[in-house]
């Protein structure tokens, strides 16, 4: 018995020694690997590298902004709770930019202040592009408290975290809905803000918070008030894919494509009694590629202690009926159109004067052909009938 035990003990010791040796070797190999560091590259500032936090980066506009930032060699962290965004869009971006230190995704809700502060404490951000928001006018009239919480309160949470962790640049995604229904057109940045729906009111409150804070801060602030967004990535990599339950609140382009694909029986145009030439609303439709370009130019031009406020639009108003005809032409589909009563909270006419952003940021909308923008978006929709689920 003693003899047997004495033979087993060295064997056990030997195995233990080998295991320790292998563990040490693995640690050495990992430490020598270029992808292994004791702290993430996202947690430290690097000379020549600008790290941008993109809130809502899994959404339609945020994902397109992330694509442009990555293409321009920015480091990007996306924070999104995926309530309106798509993980599929994030995966597309991850496949396009797989290199370490380029892109990270963090699942979090901006309504959770502890989570937001943890994110800021663990990452070295140089700037924030704040897109995350619920953004449907009709829905805002049905769920106003949700909009004030999601837009106004969450913006305050982000701003407080930026102040606490010394993040000095904010590019804020605002909206022409803050103007309401002005007496004169086109809308300039000096046009009085009198929003008429909870979406516009919540955005204006968020703007006011940012502006009040900026008065006693060296933060560089850019507020972009943009108009009706259409189009998609010309390279066909990203598109708009709202959740099925949100389609009734979505953009007119999405409804038009759904009708062309046969997902819905036809297109519903709400309101034909507006005081416009053909009775339908007039809007300024801005291509998402141009919109993203405005954000990047704003980031580049942002100055410490300064606030820039800009309208982002084409400067041309198009009626809903004009839009529908352009959509029919782009899709080649025979789309049934039903005319219904007005949607609560909508306004008759709104289009921009983009002179200020042209003069100060050297930005001009380039994708101004309505049919071409819709054709680009239609190609993505046809290739992805189930959104990113068919990617």
Swiss-Prot record:
Residues in compartment: Lumenal: 31-391
Topology, Cytoplasmic side: 1-9
Molecular function terms, GO-annotated: UDP-arabinose 4-epimerase activity; UDP-glucose 4-epimerase activity
Alphabetized UniProt keyword annotations: Carbohydrate metabolism, Golgi apparatus, Isomerase, Membrane, NAD, Signal-anchor, Transmembrane, Transmembrane helix
GO biological process: capsule polysaccharide biosynthetic process; galactose metabolic process; UDP-L-arabinose biosynthetic process
Pathway annotation from the record: Nucleotide-sugar biosynthesis; UDP-L-arabinose biosynthesis; UDP-L-arabinose from UDP-alpha-D-xylose: step 1/1; Cell wall biogenesis; cell wall polysaccharide biosynthesis
Membrane topology, as annotated: Single-pass type II membrane protein
EC identifiers of the protein: 5.1.3.5
UniProt entry tagged with the keyword Membrane: yes
Signal peptide start and end residues: none
Organism domain of life: Eukaryota
Reaction(s) this enzyme catalyzes, per UniProt: UDP-beta-L-arabinopyranose = UDP-alpha-D-xylose
Transmembrane parts of this sequence: 10-30
Cofactor or coenzyme needed: NAD(+)
Cellular localisation: Golgi apparatus, Golgi stack membrane
Family recorded in the similarity comment: Belongs to the NAD(P)-dependent epimerase/dehydratase family.
UniProt-recorded name of the protein: Probable UDP-arabinose 4-epimerase 2
């Amino acid at each position: 018995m003693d003899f047997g035990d004495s033979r087993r003990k060295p064997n056990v010791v030997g195995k233990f020694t080998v295991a320790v040796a292998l563990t040490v070797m693995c640690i050495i190999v990992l430490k020598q690997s270029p992808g292994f560091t004791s702290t993430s590259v996202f947690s430290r500032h690097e000379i020549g590298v600008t790290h941008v936090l993109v809130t809502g980066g899994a959404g339609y506009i945020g994902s397109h902004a992330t694509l442009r930032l990555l293409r321009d060699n920015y480091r990007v962290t996306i924070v999104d709770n995926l309530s309106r965004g798509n993980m599929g869009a994030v995966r597309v971006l991850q496949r396009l930019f797989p290199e370490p230190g380029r892109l990270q995704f963090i699942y979090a809700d901006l309504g959770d202040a502890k989570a937001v502060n943890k994110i800021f404490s663990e990452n070295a951000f140089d700037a924030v592009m704040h897109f995350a928001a619920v953004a449907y006018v009709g829905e805002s009239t049905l769920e106003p408290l949700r909009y004030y919480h999601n837009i106004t309160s969450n913006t305050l949470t982000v701003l407080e975290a930026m102040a606490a962790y010394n993040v000095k640049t904010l590019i804020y995604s605002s909206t022409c809905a803050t103007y309401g229904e002005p007496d004169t057109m086109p809308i300039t940045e000096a046009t009085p803000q009198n929003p008429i729906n909870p979406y516009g009111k919540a955005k204006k409150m968020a703007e006011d918070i940012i502006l009040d804070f900026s008065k006693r801060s060296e933060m560089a602030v850019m507020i972009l008030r943009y108009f009706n967004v259409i189009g998609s990535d010309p390279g066909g990599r990203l598109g708009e894919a709202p959740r099925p339950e949100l389609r009734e609140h979505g953009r007119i382009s999405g409804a038009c494509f759904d009708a062309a694909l046969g997902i819905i029986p036809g297109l519903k145009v709400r309101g034909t009694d507006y005081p416009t030439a053909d009775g339908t609303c007039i809007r300024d439709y801005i291509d998402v590629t141009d919109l993203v370009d405005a954000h990047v130019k704003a980031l580049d031009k942002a100055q410490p202690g300064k606030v820039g406020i800009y309208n982002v639009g084409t400067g041309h108003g198009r009626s809903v009926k004009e839009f529908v005809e352009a959509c029919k032409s782009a899709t080649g589909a025979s789309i049934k159109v039903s005319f219904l009563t007005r949607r609560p909270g909508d306004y008759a006419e709104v289009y921009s004067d983009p002179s200020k952003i042209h003069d100060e940021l050297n930005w001009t909308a380039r994708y101004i052909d309505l049919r071409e923008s819709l054709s680009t978006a239609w190609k993505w929709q046809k290739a992805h009938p189930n959104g990113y689920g068919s990617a």
